[in-house]
Amino acid sequence: MQTHEIRERFTNHFVNAGHQAVPSASLILDDPNLLFVNAGMVPFKPYFLGQQTPPFENGTATSIQKCVRTLDIEEVGITTRHNTFFQMAGNFSFGQYFKEGAITHAWGLLTGSVADGGFGLDPERLWVTVYLDDDEAAEIWEKKIGVPSERIQRLGMADNYWSMGVPGPCGPCSEIYYDRGEKYGKEGGPVADDNRYMEIWNLVFMEKERGQGIGKDNFDILGDLPKKNIDTGMGVERVACILQDVENVYETDLLRPVIDVAETLTGTKYGSDNTSDIRFRVIADHSRTGMMLILDGVTPGNEGRGYILRRLLRRIIRSARLLGATGETMEQFMNTIMDTMTPSYPEIADNRERIMRVAVTEERAFLKTLVSGTHLFEEAATSIKAAGSTKVAGAQAFALHDTYGFPIDLTLEMAAEAGLEVDVEGFDSLMAEQRSRAKADSQAKKHGHTDLSIYREWVDNNPTVFTGFEELDSQSKVLGLLSDGAKISEATEGQEVEVILDQSPLYAESGGQLGDRGQILLGDTVLDVHDVQKIGKKLWVHKALVANGGLAVGDEVVASVDKQWRHAARQAHTATHLIHAALRQVLGPTALQAGSMNKPGYLRFDFNYTEQLTPAQVEQIQAITNEAVDTDWAVNTVETSLEEAKAMGAMALFGENYGSTVRVVEIGGPFSMELCGGTHVAHSSQIGPVALLGESSIGSGVRRIEAYSGLNSFNYLSKERALAEGLASSLKAPSEELPERVAQLVDKLKAAEKEIEALHRQQLMAQTADLLNNAQEIGGVTTLLLRVKDNTNAGDLRTIATTLKDKLGDREGVLVIASDNAGKVPFVVAATKAAVARGAHSGNLVKLVGSYIDGRGGGKADLAQGSGANIAGLESAFGAVRAEIEAL
């Protein structure tokens, strides 16, 4: 039975039983604690917790959820039962049926006849486990279903009490196992041999909520869930393994085709030895996982999800090389896995080109690194072993990372294969030093000095109270003054200083928003604040110029925000949130923020996306953003716990460290809800118009949108309008006809350029007609050494040379054509086929000429070109060429 049929039978079984079929959610969810969806119930978590009402007609649902687990990537392929990507088929009940219903449904599908839509498994080969004290489940299995008591085994919390490993729903579970027969191990049920007895379905009786803890059995139970729920998960790949009667999941119809392709590409046979087999399985598993991650919008990167994808793709590449592949392999692997997965995921067809481009681009980049880095590692490993050591030094691992881009996990893998260990502590120490230097450089740029210990006293004892959300003017006390990185007791007129206040309404740069501008006032004393930076997330440092008067530590002052600056900064920051929301509407949920910068009237927003946006997409994003502005939504902020914010649906950035209390900025309810500590307008209409300036690539898988907001946007649009009106006037056409008129002009220009080029080539041919009259016969070789008119470009020289060479036909001939082109000396050398046979080589002659005119170049035996800088040496170069031809 093919995998897609297994999926269909599962879904049909539960739909016929009144469950609503729910499509698989994306592997990427807005959860800062979750890299990828790793269980079938994850998309249903809010319903299990009672935070949202299940939208399913009968309170029941079924889905086949794509999942990724990457905690033990290194183990993939070593065992044959685990995959990084898997499909979890599940049925869910939210307060409807409980243990008996879940058990009955599962047993009916597994043992039901194939003719009736079941899987037709032999009931005598099925075993079950239950939680230690779950007498109710054990009784249902024995009394209601008829499973003999000797095939019902009880296990502890680590095996039969399910949770996600983090706070959330949990409960006892009952697992169904299939006995694969005595050739796979000893008898005695799952407790005796879990290789012979393969787990295929887990029925979780979701009735409790777990708290913090470690491991599978060391956590607190916080209490009961609002309702008794059912969450089950059947491993599609494992059931396929049984129904297709193959040894393991890698032999099924989904993964075996990739192994077959790998055999062809590498010349190695699967099954020949264990080490090779592990590499084959790595290729098959990672090809599927990598493809599905790219499908859901993940791009290779150096952290978070992007790093996991990069690591998977690089393990594919390296495994293929170790098996014997010599060229690129990613295209073949990706094509194969897309073919096998498309019947279950038809959306692959629409994304095929993008998936291929991302994977192949990563392969080509890594292959350049792999060869040189592997050579360096092998040299290091040889010297380490020769010295009688078994450890790769931290400095060596760091050099591989810093110079060749080798991630530490790849070095660890290579070291293990070579029987070596790695000084990970030493590596981490060097990485920390590098980060510290980078941080110091960044701080030096912001503060003019790298020693931040000078702020320690205030950070520890007098953190700044920020009042800028409530007021723009604040009574403050001067706690400290600094100049050129040193503490001072007073500041005088004309001095550039850093001012520490006990409280301040001025926003310190963070979250992409620039620090406020403003003033610090005391009587006639005026300090113009031109930047505010944050130290240790607690201390505000006001960089200011004493414009008038003087200031001393202990003075009571008024700190005042430049109100125009703040208003325009608020406009830009709120516009950033709207653009982010619009991006996700147009491009999908994986278009997540990768960075931003907001300042008055201007913003730039970086986001994860692999492809250039079309003009239509940019226009749509701008339209959605301005519609949100026009709707005049209230911009609400609330401080709450991180868990509550996530329950509200607030978007958090993966990898960010959030405190126990976070600030949620909500605009238009579900339209935009993000964790943010910045300043914002009160209503979206206060932003004014938002004008997108365009989008561009700033790195692999990261793109940038830039925009104006408020008055800057109005001014920009006014200039654009004036430009359009000017063009319309010049072209004597209405504005709406400008695109067509400009296109017509461009077409005419291209046609004129082609005509000019044709005339130019005609003139060139006419000029070359008699040039061979200047040729000399040197030892039977027709030789033309010629300086043509000045400012003849390299392309024309090449045309002249090839034309003359063709005219020589079967004769032995060598041509050197050069010109003085604004101080540069382009030149071309050509040799006929007969001359090449005699020993002439254009590439060698180019190097010879270049040595006389301070130039260089290269090419093939029959045609080569170069460029020099010393026209005065050309005659000597010609003489050298004559001598070279005489020697042929």
From Swiss-Prot:
EC number(s) reported in the record: 6.1.1.7
UniProt entry tagged with the keyword Ligase: yes
Domain of life: Bacteria
Catalytic activity from the UniProt record: tRNA(Ala) + L-alanine + ATP = L-alanyl-tRNA(Ala) + AMP + diphosphate
Pfam families named in the record: DHHA1, tRNA-synt_2c, tRNA_SAD
Biological process terms in GO annotation: alanyl-tRNA aminoacylation
SMART domains for this protein: tRNA_SAD
Cofactors demanded by this protein: Zn(2+)
Cofactor note: Binds 1 zinc ion per subunit.
Subcellular location: Cytoplasm
Protein residues bound to Zn(2+): H573, H577, C676, H680
InterPro entries linked: aa-tRNA-synth_II/BPL/LPL (IPR045864), Ala-tRNA-lgiase_IIc (IPR002318), Ala-tRNA-ligase_IIc_anticod-bd (IPR018162), Ala-tRNA-synth_IIc_core (IPR018165), Ala-tRNA-synth_IIc_N (IPR018164), Ala-tRNA_ligase (IPR050058), Ala_tRNA_ligase_euk/bac (IPR023033), DHHA1_dom (IPR003156)
Family membership: Belongs to the class-II aminoacyl-tRNA synthetase family.
PANTHER family assigned to the protein according to its UniProt record, in alphabetical order: ALANINE--TRNA LIGASE, CYTOPLASMIC, ALANYL-TRNA SYNTHETASE
Protein name according to UniProt: Alanine--tRNA ligase
Originating organism: Corynebacterium glutamicum (strain ATCC 13032 / DSM 20300 / JCM 1318 / BCRC 11384 / CCUG 27702 / LMG 3730 / NBRC 12168 / NCIMB 10025 / NRRL B-2784 / 534)
Organism ancestry: Bacteria, Bacillati, Actinomycetota, Actinomycetes, Mycobacteriales
Gene: alaS
